[in-house]
């Protein structure tokens, strides 16, 4: 997990796909289990922002892969796309995917010499209200900065100054607040069945298929129920669920 922390402190867009199977250790290598959620939420040394997106079926997994990369670049952070093993090793016939739904979002990109120091280093980690600093492209004039595994100034220079440390930590963590505000509700959770039903099942991952089928069978018997499928595990959609 050292690589996750390195990407986190350097605000490097990174997407990791994790297929869950039974543990611990070798555990149940050919069986599906939802036992890695705490791992992806907490893996790494110290704290850094991460977004965790969970797909419920193969169609979602296709579109979510593109969404995960957009999150990573938009918020310049680690994104974990988490799937149950039952989905990762599953074969299923599906209608052709709608490629028109796929959008590529590169996030905030710095303009050449846009920071007023054409010959100097670029403040890659300048403090911003959103926590996101425009990133320079490779070779961009005036875009030089430093990337290390240590805490750093706005230019990337290693420092152990407690004031700078606090500022940079808070800057990075503000990204989760920004993401929570900007990510559409449909990407955070989805509701299946009768929206007004008093009986609610709260679930995530590959349980979706069996639950949706069960709700349909209950409806045939005159029993109203609904599934709330949580898709965004971090930042967790508390206001939307309330």
Predicted segment positions?
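Thiamine diphosphate
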Residues: 1-42, 51-72, 220
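Generic structural motif recognizing short loop/turn segments at the entrances and edges of beta-strands
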Residues: 33-36, 49, 143, 185-187
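Structural motif
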Residues: 12-17, 38, 48-52, 77-81, ...
